[in-house]
Amino acid sequence: MTAPSQVLKIRRPDDWHLHLRDGDMLKTVVPYTSEIYGRAIVMPNLAPPVTTVEAAVAYRQRILDAVPAGHDFTPLMTCYLTDSLDPNELERGFNEGVFTAAKLYPANATTNSSHGVTSVDAIMPVLERMEKIGMPLLVHGEVTHADIDIFDREARFIESVMEPLRQRLTALKVVFEHITTKDAADYVRDGNERLAATITPQHLMFNRNHMLVGGVRPHLYCLPILKRNIHQQALRELVASGFNRVFLGTDSAPHARHRKESSCGCAGCFNAPTALGSYATVFEEMNALQHFEAFCSVNGPQFYGLPVNDTFIELVREEQQVAESIALTDDTLVPFLAGETVRWSVKQ
């Protein structure tokens, strides 16, 4: 006789960092998010990037058109900051409810970020306007100088960019996205109520050994890159502590298989199908399931000044196997934990 499976009921979560891409890829991946999450902060790094209200409205409609009937999902749009962005356009989008936040990519830090910001000084008028109107700044926190080691880029960003910026614009709300280091965990924990962070499932579950020992695992390659074990442990301890300015942001970032399994592969984990169960596994391992709902469903809305979702979902603790791949029009998509047996999954 099998033991009854354990069920975890939580308020419907939100994903505060998500890549949906565009075109056929968007149509394939949207349902994996919209069936579980009430809202998601949608990244603007398309080609070309989303830098105008008009582009954001059109992109939001393409996303909504891809949401299956019966799913109640709201995409929250972001503006891609560039050196030439007009502060008035940004403010208009925020006031009209089109832009929820703006995204700072250091130029060439990650996928489709060649249009990114060359220096914080270059966009200071925009950042000052954001501070004035209360618009959150979302930051990919890595320096991109060629001489700085890839494993050190987040820590260096804190001292050279993040801290000077926050000293200068003390009222600016900042989300330090997808943090990966003890340095960042400590920095956010020691910060004030205007600084928060998101953490991905892969950075909680894995460290760089998992990606590199016994063969390179391209589907664990993302940016910021997985770090050593001490950093992974610091992230796990931060979420397990119940700290209320860290929240769910999957950074789910789909690439077709041939673009991942390549001599020069793309960065990004497509974790939308398995992220929530992965987070539950980590919280269970840390004996911190009492803080799971807040991380998924409460801390984010609280920081953004939005209401929590009023519906609930259930996760069930029973072993299930993750699909090896998901069909695309002319390729396949390999989900995070493909082919593996997972402990927690969303109850259908």
From Swiss-Prot:
Sorted alphabetically, the keyword list is: Hydrolase, Metal-binding, Pyrimidine biosynthesis, Zinc
Q: What does this protein do?
A: Catalyzes the reversible cyclization of carbamoyl aspartate to dihydroorotate.
EC number(s) from the headed UniProt entry: 3.5.2.3
Name used for this protein in its record: Dihydroorotase
Q: NCBIfam families, per this entry?
A: pyrC_dimer
List required co-factors.
Zn(2+)
Q: What Gene Ontology terms for biological process does this UniProt record contain?
A: 'de novo' pyrimidine nucleobase biosynthetic process; 'de novo' UMP biosynthetic process
> What does the subunit comment say?
Homodimer.
- GO CC annotation, single: cytosol
